[in-house]
Amino acid sequence: MQSTGAPGLAQSAVLQLSAMGERSRELGGALREPERKRRLLLVVVCVALLLDNMLYMVIVPIIPDYLADLRGERGNSSADLDIQIGVLFASKALLQLLVNPLSGTFIDRVGYDLPLLIGLLVMFLSTCIFAFAENYGTLFAARSLQGLGSAFADTSGIAMIADKFTEEAERSRALGIALAFISFGSLVAPPFGGILYEFAGKRVPFIVLACVCLADGVLLLTVVKPFSDRTRENMPVGTPIHRLMVDPYIAVVAGALTVCNIPLAFLEPTIANWMESTMDASKWQMGLVWLPAFLPHVLGVYITVRLAARYPERQWFYGALGMVIIGASSCTVPACKTFGELVFPLCGICFGIALVDTALLPTLAFLVDVRHVSVYGSVYAIADISYSVAYAMGPVVAGQIVHNLGFVQLNLGMGLVNVLYAPALLLLRPVCQIKPSFSERNVLLEEGPSGLYDSIRLEERALRRKGLSAGAGTEHGLRGRSEEEEESGPESA
């Protein structure tokens, strides 16, 4: 009986191993499907952006109290504490601002996968250091290290979305989803950090974020091969970042991204003290004042994506309208006397920012497509620089303006700058007018693949557009390169 049972057990084990191998091959094949792979990469990028913004904001309710305890031990003054908090908040954006030109060039040369993995690993290390930091110097190092990780993860993530989703409507939709995750991370992090800090201690919020970051990195490794030489061999030569910076259309978009984020960046470090002195706000009110703004932000993203799908030539108008809404809302903030009243202008600011970001981030990729080479690392490094300028100045400059001029003057100035900048987006109108014809032309192209990820897109295009002829009109006058350069970049799906 034992002699006949052993072969049966062995055969059963072989069959089970064979079935497991078959399931693994099926899973690997499913992950290699272009559409599914593209969606998984969108999930990876959105989680990375969520983590970065949660880590940026989760320290808001934790660090002041933690540094106050350290101050009690060392006898530092309250003024020194305010300076330490301001420098700590600004250090991330400052380092991100310095590293972005280098990270953008690096992304253009090696692709999007490896820089995203590097960014996630650095963010994981930064989060772990935050969890176990015991002094201000270590906290400062962790905060600065987060800026280094963000320069790689944020830029490569947004650039990867632009590269994978090349049709204008789906690109706007994918970038809109990413922006919703950014907003959710920024707004939910303070209550998340405050609750866990209150009931579980300082380390727990950071350990949770570190675990999610590690899981996101593992998911990225299952979807792509960041160390593959094939990707780097197929990379077209991108336009240098200094040439993109002097492009007038890209400069207008970068300026708008900076200006529209100034109210949010300047109000975050100043509004709590103003609420306490003006309306005697409680701690929970100061902690939750931004949370209701999440819904208007998501609504703004949704509306802009739907409008961009139907009227892509009006992207400049959506951005200009958003800046006017931001300006008007910023001017009304000082007039609020209660917590309920204050929620409305803050919602207006976030709604306007959603309009501007959702309209202009896809426009940056489109500008690179029609005027340069379709490689997006450097152009989205410029976008990240624009955000970093606002958030680097916020914690340092806003407090000085409030101290010297007053909170009312700060808000009126921010509102006026946004309203005055809005007409500058009229300069984008000629470029936005060609969006429908350019999108149609790219959809009908049938040349062979030559750029990054073009093979995947060619397969998708053959499946979706089978039987269509390649005879659309041309837009040579608006392209800043020859036909060979034009087709070397990623093509539309």
Curated annotation (Swiss-Prot):
Residues of this chain annotated as glycosylated in UniProt: 76
Sequence intervals crossing the membrane: 40-60, 87-107, 114-134, 144-164, 175-195, 204-224, 248-268, 285-305, 316-336, 348-368, 379-399, 407-427
Ranges facing Lumenal, vesicle side: 61-86, 135-143, 196-203, 269-284, 337-347, 400-406
A GO cellular component entry from the record: AP-2 adaptor complex
Family matches, as CDD domains: MFS_SLC18A3_VAChT
Intracellular or extracellular location(s): Membrane
Biased composition (Acidic residues): 483-493
GO biological process assignments: chemical synaptic transmission; establishment of localization in cell; serotonin transport
Key word Membrane present: yes
Chain spans, region Disordered: 467-493
One Pfam entry name: MFS_1
Signal peptide boundaries: none
GO molecular function per UniProt: acetylcholine transmembrane transporter activity; xenobiotic transmembrane transporter activity
Stretches assigned to the Cytoplasmic side: 1-39, 108-113, 165-174, 225-247, 306-315, 369-378, 428-493
Keyword entries, A-Z: Glycoprotein, Membrane, Neurotransmitter transport, Transmembrane, Transmembrane helix, Transport
Family as reported in the entry's similarity comment: Belongs to the major facilitator superfamily. Vesicular transporter family.
Its job: Involved in acetylcholine transport into synaptic vesicles.
Protein name: Probable vesicular acetylcholine transporter-B
Organism taxonomic ancestry: Eukaryota, Metazoa, Chordata, Craniata, Vertebrata
Gene encoding the protein: slc18a3b
